[in-house]
Protein backbone atom coordinates (compact mmCIF):
# COMPACT_ATOMS: atom_id res chain seq x y z
CA UNK A 1 0.00 0.00 0.00
CA UNK A 2 1.42 3.38 -1.02
CA UNK A 3 1.47 6.35 1.35
CA UNK A 4 1.99 9.93 0.17
CA UNK A 5 2.09 13.03 2.38
CA UNK A 6 1.88 16.75 1.61
CA UNK A 7 2.06 19.87 3.76
CA UNK A 8 -0.64 22.26 2.55
CA UNK A 9 -1.69 25.82 3.30
CA UNK A 10 -5.16 26.52 4.70
CA UNK A 11 -6.17 27.78 1.26
CA UNK A 12 -5.01 24.57 -0.44
CA UNK A 13 -6.82 22.44 2.14
CA UNK A 14 -10.03 24.38 1.53
CA UNK A 15 -9.62 23.80 -2.20
CA UNK A 16 -9.00 20.09 -1.69
CA UNK A 17 -12.06 19.71 0.55
CA UNK A 18 -14.20 21.34 -2.14
CA UNK A 19 -13.20 18.72 -4.71
CA UNK A 20 -14.49 15.60 -2.94
CA UNK A 21 -16.74 14.84 0.01
CA UNK A 22 -15.01 14.63 3.41
CA UNK A 23 -16.21 13.40 6.80
CA UNK A 24 -15.45 15.87 9.60
CA UNK A 25 -17.11 14.19 12.60
CA UNK A 26 -16.12 11.33 14.93
CA UNK A 27 -12.48 11.47 13.86
CA UNK A 28 -9.33 10.56 15.81
CA UNK A 29 -7.64 13.33 17.76
CA UNK A 30 -5.46 15.47 15.53
CA UNK A 31 -7.41 14.68 12.36
CA UNK A 32 -9.43 17.40 10.63
CA UNK A 33 -11.17 15.45 7.85
CA UNK A 34 -11.22 12.06 6.14
CA UNK A 35 -12.46 10.84 2.77
CA UNK A 36 -12.54 7.66 0.71
CA UNK A 37 -11.98 8.30 -2.99
CA UNK A 38 -11.22 5.72 -5.70
CA UNK A 39 -10.14 3.10 -3.14
CA UNK A 40 -7.79 5.63 -1.55
CA UNK A 41 -8.08 7.07 1.95
CA UNK A 42 -7.37 10.79 2.20
CA UNK A 43 -6.64 12.07 5.73
CA UNK A 44 -6.29 15.78 6.51
CA UNK A 45 -4.61 16.57 9.83
CA UNK A 46 -4.88 19.66 12.01
CA UNK A 47 -1.16 20.19 11.41
CA UNK A 48 -1.89 20.94 7.75
CA UNK A 49 -0.52 17.65 6.47
CA UNK A 50 -2.53 15.51 4.06
CA UNK A 51 -1.97 11.77 3.68
CA UNK A 52 -3.07 9.63 0.74
CA UNK A 53 -3.18 5.89 1.55
CA UNK A 54 -3.89 3.06 -0.86
CA UNK A 55 -2.68 1.27 -3.96
CA UNK A 56 -3.80 4.24 -6.09
CA UNK A 57 -2.50 6.93 -3.73
CA UNK A 58 -0.12 8.42 -6.27
CA UNK A 59 -2.73 8.66 -9.02
CA UNK A 60 -5.34 10.14 -6.69
CA UNK A 61 -2.91 12.69 -5.27
CA UNK A 62 -1.93 13.74 -8.79
CA UNK A 63 -5.59 14.16 -9.68
CA UNK A 64 -6.55 16.14 -6.57
CA UNK A 65 -3.27 18.00 -6.04
CA UNK A 66 -1.53 18.02 -9.44
CA UNK A 67 0.91 20.84 -8.72
CA UNK A 68 1.83 19.65 -5.22
CA UNK A 69 2.19 16.05 -6.34
CA UNK A 70 4.88 16.98 -8.86
CA UNK A 71 6.67 19.25 -6.37
CA UNK A 72 6.69 16.52 -3.74
CA UNK A 73 8.16 14.01 -6.19
CA UNK A 74 10.96 16.41 -7.15
CA UNK A 75 11.72 17.31 -3.53
CA UNK A 76 11.89 13.65 -2.55
CA UNK A 77 14.34 12.87 -5.35
CA UNK A 78 16.58 15.82 -4.41
CA UNK A 79 16.42 15.00 -0.71
CA UNK A 80 17.33 11.37 -1.24
CA UNK A 81 20.27 12.34 -3.45
CA UNK A 82 21.57 15.15 -1.26
CA UNK A 83 21.16 13.63 2.17
CA UNK A 84 22.57 10.14 2.38
CA UNK A 85 22.22 10.17 6.18
CA UNK A 86 18.44 10.03 5.74
CA UNK A 87 18.92 6.88 3.73
CA UNK A 88 21.00 5.08 6.30
CA UNK A 89 18.35 2.36 6.01
CA UNK A 90 19.96 0.50 8.82
CA UNK A 91 18.95 -3.10 8.44
CA UNK A 92 15.67 -2.87 10.33
CA UNK A 93 14.15 -0.26 8.03
CA UNK A 94 14.42 -2.73 5.17
CA UNK A 95 12.11 -5.14 7.00
CA UNK A 96 8.74 -5.26 8.75
CA UNK A 97 9.45 -4.70 12.43
CA UNK A 98 7.82 -4.27 15.80
CA UNK A 99 9.77 -1.73 17.82
CA UNK A 100 9.32 -0.98 21.52
CA UNK A 101 10.45 1.83 23.79
CA UNK A 102 9.43 3.60 26.99
CA UNK A 103 9.20 7.07 28.52
CA UNK A 104 9.16 8.43 32.06
CA UNK A 105 11.63 6.06 33.68
CA UNK A 106 14.06 8.87 34.54
CA UNK A 107 11.39 11.35 35.61
CA UNK A 108 10.34 11.76 39.23
CA UNK A 109 6.88 12.95 38.29
CA UNK A 110 4.51 11.07 36.05
CA UNK A 111 3.95 7.47 34.99
CA UNK A 112 6.04 4.94 33.12
CA UNK A 113 4.72 4.55 29.58
CA UNK A 114 5.66 1.81 27.13
CA UNK A 115 4.72 1.46 23.47
CA UNK A 116 5.26 -1.23 20.87
CA UNK A 117 4.60 -0.33 17.23
CA UNK A 118 4.55 -2.29 13.96
CA UNK A 119 6.28 -0.51 11.08
CA UNK A 120 6.42 -2.09 7.63
CA UNK A 121 8.86 -1.39 4.81
CA UNK A 122 6.06 0.50 3.10
CA UNK A 123 5.71 2.82 6.09
CA UNK A 124 9.34 3.97 5.97
CA UNK A 125 9.03 6.65 3.23
CA UNK A 126 5.96 8.23 4.80
CA UNK A 127 7.54 8.23 8.27
CA UNK A 128 10.58 10.02 6.92
CA UNK A 129 8.35 12.52 5.13
CA UNK A 130 6.43 13.18 8.35
CA UNK A 131 9.72 13.83 10.12
CA UNK A 132 9.85 10.82 12.44
CA UNK A 133 13.19 10.84 14.23
CA UNK A 134 14.82 10.07 17.55
CA UNK A 135 12.34 11.59 20.05
CA UNK A 136 15.23 13.07 22.04
CA UNK A 137 15.83 15.38 19.08
CA UNK A 138 12.18 16.50 18.93
CA UNK A 139 10.36 19.17 20.90
CA UNK A 140 7.31 18.24 22.95
CA UNK A 141 5.14 20.13 20.47
CA UNK A 142 6.55 18.14 17.55
CA UNK A 143 6.13 14.86 19.43
CA UNK A 144 2.45 15.60 20.07
CA UNK A 145 1.91 16.58 16.43
CA UNK A 146 3.59 13.42 15.13
CA UNK A 147 2.01 11.02 17.61
CA UNK A 148 -1.52 12.21 16.85
CA UNK A 149 -0.88 11.29 13.22
CA UNK A 150 1.02 8.05 13.84
CA UNK A 151 -1.66 6.47 16.01
CA UNK A 152 -4.15 6.74 13.13
CA UNK A 153 -2.30 4.30 10.86
CA UNK A 154 0.45 2.47 12.79
CA UNK A 155 -0.65 -0.72 14.64
CA UNK A 156 0.53 -0.22 18.21
CA UNK A 157 -0.03 -0.95 21.88
CA UNK A 158 0.43 1.74 24.52
CA UNK A 159 0.65 0.76 28.19
CA UNK A 160 0.77 3.15 31.14
CA UNK A 161 1.94 2.22 34.64
CA UNK A 162 0.45 4.99 36.75
CA UNK A 163 2.22 6.23 39.86
CA UNK A 164 -0.02 4.52 42.39
CA UNK A 165 0.53 1.09 40.82
CA UNK A 166 4.20 1.88 40.15
CA UNK A 167 4.80 2.66 43.82
CA UNK A 168 3.00 -0.49 44.95
CA UNK A 169 5.11 -2.69 42.69
CA UNK A 170 8.31 -0.88 43.68
CA UNK A 171 7.51 -1.43 47.35
CA UNK A 172 7.16 -5.15 46.59
CA UNK A 173 10.73 -5.18 45.33
CA UNK A 174 10.15 -4.64 41.63
CA UNK A 175 13.00 -2.74 40.00
CA UNK A 176 12.43 -0.47 37.03
CA UNK A 177 14.09 -3.10 34.87
CA UNK A 178 11.46 -5.64 35.88
CA UNK A 179 8.62 -3.18 35.33
CA UNK A 180 9.90 -2.29 31.88
CA UNK A 181 10.51 -5.91 30.91
CA UNK A 182 6.94 -6.86 31.84
CA UNK A 183 5.43 -3.87 30.04
CA UNK A 184 7.54 -4.23 26.88
CA UNK A 185 6.73 -7.92 26.65
CA UNK A 186 3.01 -7.29 27.13
CA UNK A 187 2.91 -4.45 24.60
CA UNK A 188 4.71 -6.58 22.00
CA UNK A 189 2.25 -9.43 22.54
CA UNK A 190 -0.65 -7.01 22.12
CA UNK A 191 0.70 -5.82 18.77
CA UNK A 192 1.24 -9.40 17.59
CA UNK A 193 -2.48 -9.98 18.14
CA UNK A 194 -3.26 -7.07 15.81
CA UNK A 195 -1.09 -8.09 12.86
CA UNK A 196 -0.33 -11.06 10.63
CA UNK A 197 2.80 -12.36 12.36
CA UNK A 198 3.86 -14.17 9.19
CA UNK A 199 4.60 -10.71 7.76
CA UNK A 200 6.88 -9.84 10.69
CA UNK A 201 10.65 -9.95 10.21
CA UNK A 202 12.00 -8.62 13.50
CA UNK A 203 11.04 -7.45 16.97
CA UNK A 204 13.46 -4.71 18.03
CA UNK A 205 13.60 -3.58 21.66
CA UNK A 206 15.39 -0.42 22.72
CA UNK A 207 17.82 -2.11 25.08
CA UNK A 208 17.57 -1.28 28.78
CA UNK A 209 18.87 -4.70 29.88
CA UNK A 210 20.67 -7.65 28.35
CA UNK A 211 18.54 -10.36 26.78
CA UNK A 212 18.99 -12.81 29.65
CA UNK A 213 18.03 -10.17 32.23
CA UNK A 214 15.01 -9.09 30.21
CA UNK A 215 13.92 -12.71 29.82
CA UNK A 216 14.31 -13.33 33.56
CA UNK A 217 12.12 -10.38 34.54
CA UNK A 218 9.47 -10.47 31.81
CA UNK A 219 7.26 -12.95 33.77
CA UNK A 220 6.31 -14.68 30.52
CA UNK A 221 8.22 -16.06 27.56
CA UNK A 222 9.58 -13.70 24.93
CA UNK A 223 7.32 -14.11 21.87
CA UNK A 224 9.23 -15.13 18.74
CA UNK A 225 12.64 -15.12 20.47
CA UNK A 226 14.55 -15.92 17.26
CA UNK A 227 13.19 -12.74 15.69
CA UNK A 228 13.79 -10.58 18.77
CA UNK A 229 16.75 -8.19 18.84
CA UNK A 230 17.98 -5.75 21.50
CA UNK A 231 19.58 -2.51 20.32
CA UNK A 232 21.24 0.27 22.29
CA UNK A 233 20.31 3.73 21.00
CA UNK A 234 17.59 1.92 19.10
CA UNK A 235 15.70 5.06 18.06
CA UNK A 236 18.51 5.97 15.68
CA UNK A 237 18.70 2.44 14.26
CA UNK A 238 15.05 1.56 13.72
CA UNK A 239 12.08 3.67 12.71
CA UNK A 240 9.85 1.16 14.50
CA UNK A 241 11.57 2.04 17.78
CA UNK A 242 11.46 5.74 16.90
CA UNK A 243 7.69 5.51 16.38
CA UNK A 244 7.23 3.62 19.65
CA UNK A 245 9.35 6.22 21.42
CA UNK A 246 7.30 9.10 20.05
CA UNK A 247 3.97 7.52 21.05
CA UNK A 248 5.17 6.57 24.54
CA UNK A 249 6.64 10.05 25.00
CA UNK A 250 3.38 11.58 23.79
CA UNK A 251 1.44 9.67 26.44
CA UNK A 252 3.88 10.81 29.11
CA UNK A 253 3.76 14.46 28.00
CA UNK A 254 -0.05 14.42 27.92
CA UNK A 255 -0.21 13.01 31.45
CA UNK A 256 2.30 15.58 32.74
CA UNK A 257 0.23 18.39 31.22
CA UNK A 258 -2.85 17.04 32.99
CA UNK A 259 -1.02 16.90 36.34
CA UNK A 260 0.09 20.51 35.88
CA UNK A 261 -3.51 21.60 35.28
CA UNK A 262 -4.80 19.66 38.27
CA UNK A 263 -2.43 21.28 40.77
CA UNK A 264 -2.19 24.68 39.08
CA UNK A 265 1.58 24.71 38.62
CA UNK A 266 3.97 23.61 35.90
CA UNK A 267 5.46 20.21 36.67
CA UNK A 268 9.05 19.88 35.41
CA UNK A 269 10.36 16.74 33.78
CA UNK A 270 13.48 14.92 34.90
CA UNK A 271 14.80 14.61 38.44
CA UNK A 272 16.89 17.75 38.98
CA UNK A 273 16.87 20.58 41.50
CA UNK A 274 13.82 22.27 39.94
CA UNK A 275 11.88 19.10 40.57
CA UNK A 276 12.84 19.19 44.27
CA UNK A 277 11.46 22.73 44.62
CA UNK A 278 8.14 21.91 42.94
CA UNK A 279 7.81 18.72 45.00
CA UNK A 280 8.29 20.79 48.16
CA UNK A 281 5.57 23.22 47.05
CA UNK A 282 3.19 20.33 46.42
CA UNK A 283 3.83 18.93 49.90
CA UNK A 284 3.22 22.37 51.42
CA UNK A 285 0.03 23.04 49.45
CA UNK A 286 -1.49 19.57 49.13
CA UNK A 287 0.33 17.18 51.46
CA UNK A 288 2.78 14.32 51.00
CA UNK A 289 0.05 11.87 49.91
CA UNK A 290 -0.85 14.05 46.95
CA UNK A 291 2.80 14.23 45.96
CA UNK A 292 3.14 10.45 46.16
CA UNK A 293 0.08 9.98 43.94
CA UNK A 294 1.79 11.73 41.02
CA UNK A 295 5.40 10.70 41.53
CA UNK A 296 7.80 7.78 41.94
CA UNK A 297 8.31 7.55 45.71
CA UNK A 298 11.71 5.87 45.68
CA UNK A 299 13.43 8.74 43.84
CA UNK A 300 15.69 10.90 46.03
CA UNK A 301 13.64 13.96 45.09
CA UNK A 302 11.05 13.07 47.71
CA UNK A 303 13.59 13.21 50.53
CA UNK A 304 15.17 16.39 49.15
CA UNK A 305 11.77 18.09 48.97
CA UNK A 306 11.10 17.27 52.61
CA UNK A 307 14.48 18.75 53.58
CA UNK A 308 13.64 21.96 51.73
CA UNK A 309 10.53 22.32 53.90
CA UNK A 310 12.22 21.69 57.26
CA UNK A 311 13.52 25.26 57.77
CA UNK A 312 10.09 26.71 56.95
UniProtKB/Swiss-Prot annotation:
It is found in: Cytoplasm. Keywords: Cytoplasm, Endonuclease, Hydrolase, Magnesium, Metal-binding, Nuclease. It comes from the Bacteria. Its main location: cytoplasm. Its EC number is 3.1.26.4. GO terms for biological process: DNA replication, removal of RNA primer; mismatch repair. Signal peptide: none annotated. One of its GO terms (cellular component) is cytoplasm. It catalyses: Endonucleolytic cleavage to 5'-phosphomonoester. Belongs to the RNase HII family. RnhC subfamily. This is Ribonuclease HIII.
Amino acid sequence: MANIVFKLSDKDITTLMSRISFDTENLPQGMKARAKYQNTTVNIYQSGKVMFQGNHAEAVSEELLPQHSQLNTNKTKKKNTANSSLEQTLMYDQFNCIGSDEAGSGDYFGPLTVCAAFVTKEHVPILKTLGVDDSKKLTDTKIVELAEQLVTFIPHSLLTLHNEKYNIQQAKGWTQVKMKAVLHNEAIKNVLEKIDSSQLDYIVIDQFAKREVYSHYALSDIPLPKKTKFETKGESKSLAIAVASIISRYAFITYMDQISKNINMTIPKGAGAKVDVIAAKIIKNYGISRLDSISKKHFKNREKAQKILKPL
